[in-house]
Curated annotation (Swiss-Prot):
Name by which UniProt lists this protein: Putative pyruvate, phosphate dikinase regulatory protein
Organism: Rickettsia bellii (strain OSU 85-389)
Class in the EC hierarchy, top level: transferase
PANTHER family: PYRUVATE, PHOSPHATE DIKINASE REGULATORY PROTEIN 1, CHLOROPLASTIC
Similarity comment: Belongs to the pyruvate, phosphate/water dikinase regulatory protein family. PDRP subfamily.
GO MF annotations, alphabetized: ADP binding; ATP binding; phosphotransferase activity, phosphate group as acceptor; protein serine/threonine kinase activity
InterPro entries referenced in this protein's UniProt entry, alphabetically: Kinase-pyrophosphorylase, PPDK_reg
EC nos: 2.7.11.32, 2.7.4.27
Stored Pfam families: Kinase-PPPase
Keywords: Kinase, Nucleotide-binding, Serine/threonine-protein kinase, Transferase
Role, per record: Bifunctional serine/threonine kinase and phosphorylase involved in the regulation of the pyruvate, phosphate dikinase (PPDK) by catalyzing its phosphorylation/dephosphorylation.
Reaction equation(s) it catalyzes: N(tele)-phospho-L-histidyl/L-threonyl-[pyruvate, phosphate dikinase] + ADP = N(tele)-phospho-L-histidyl/O-phospho-L-threonyl-[pyruvate, phosphate dikinase] + AMP + H(+); N(tele)-phospho-L-histidyl/O-phospho-L-threonyl-[pyruvate, phosphate dikinase] + phosphate + H(+) = N(tele)-phospho-L-histidyl/L-threonyl-[pyruvate, phosphate dikinase] + diphosphate
Residues that bind ADP: G149, P150, S151, R152, T153, S154, K155, T156
Length: 273
């Protein structure tokens, strides 16, 4: 079979480019593709890393990037290397603009429906729901990503966000003085990421939750020393196993998920070399 390298470059989650790539590859049964994912490329420093990899691993480039300067840099670089650089929805947007007489404002995301990517996303969402909050730990081998962290560190919404981007994500809470699942003693292929937060901020979030639930007695849940120990213990667990840790104190769900996706795809790209 003929090998084909495809670089998927996006300022978002690469799902649009990935969907287009899979739909196109379905027309070629004799091709053996190797896809490199480059999500959340939103500045020149991140793009430099991508360009370096494109230079060392020549292949077709599919991109969805809204920033004009980044697009110019990418297309010029590929032109000089004499490799195809294709805007996945650029032609469509241009024709819509010409036909309607309305100027282009920005590139919008879109999805091909009912292709492999669509069903991968549905499966990932189902997986995230069934493996929320430490459920079905015997099925962690089917995950792409495992999140660990104290309660209320945005593990569940981050898992769902990642699932909407096609990544099967399980999450496991860490509770002070409770035994942690023995999976941490094993070598696993999945990306494990620890989520921590400023203890004072976490106490605020937990107190708000207790008030909403009208629960008055749960001292350990909002005790500063215990909350601090929970975060420190998660850091310790991750550092001992070289698992990345993300402080979510000032990050939105999207920002946290973007960091995790970047780590995940960097790891995947590394093993695809």
């Amino acid at each position: 079979m003929t090998k084909l390298i495809i670089h998927l470059v996006s300022d978002s989650s690469v799902q649009t480019a990935k969907s287009a790539a899979h739909s196109s590859l379905a027309q070629f049964t004799s091709l053996k593709p190797k896809l490199y994912h480059w999500p959340m490329i939103r500045n020149s420093e991140l793009l430099k890393e991508v360009l370096s990899n494109i230079e060392s691993k020549h292949g077709i480039v599919l991109y969805t990037i809204a920033d004009q300067e980044l697009r110019k840099t990418l297309t010029k670089f590929c032109y000089e290397l004499k490799i195809p650089c294709i805007s996945v929805i650029g032609k469509i947007i241009k024709e819509m603009s010409v036909f309607s007489g309305i100027e282009i404002e920005k590139e919008q995301n879109y999805n091909y429906k009912f292709d492999k990517t669509y069903f991968d996303t549905l499966n990932a969402i189902d997986y995230a729901i069934r493996h929320d909050d430490g459920q079905l730990l015997n099925e962690l081998q089917f995950a792409d990503i495992v999140l660990i962290g104290p309660s209320r560190t945005s593990k569940t919404p981050t898992s769902v966000f990642l699932a909407y981007n096609g990544l099967k994500t399980a999450n496991i809470p860490y509770v002070y003085n409770c035994p942690f699942p023995d999976f941490i003693e094993k070598d696993i292929d999945q990306l494990v990421v620890g989520l921590v937060i400023n203890p004072n901020r976490l106490i605020e979030i937990r107190e708000t939750r207790l008030n909403l639930l009208q629960i008055n007695e749960n001292r350990n849940y909002t005790d500063f020393n215990i909350v601090q120990k929970e975060c420190l213990e998660v850091k310790k667990i991750c550092e001992l196993r070289n698992w990345p840790v993300i402080d979510v104190s000032t990050k939105s769900i999207e920002e946290t998920a973007a960091l995790i996706m970047r780590i995940y795809y960097n790891k995947k790209n590394k093993y695809n070399k």
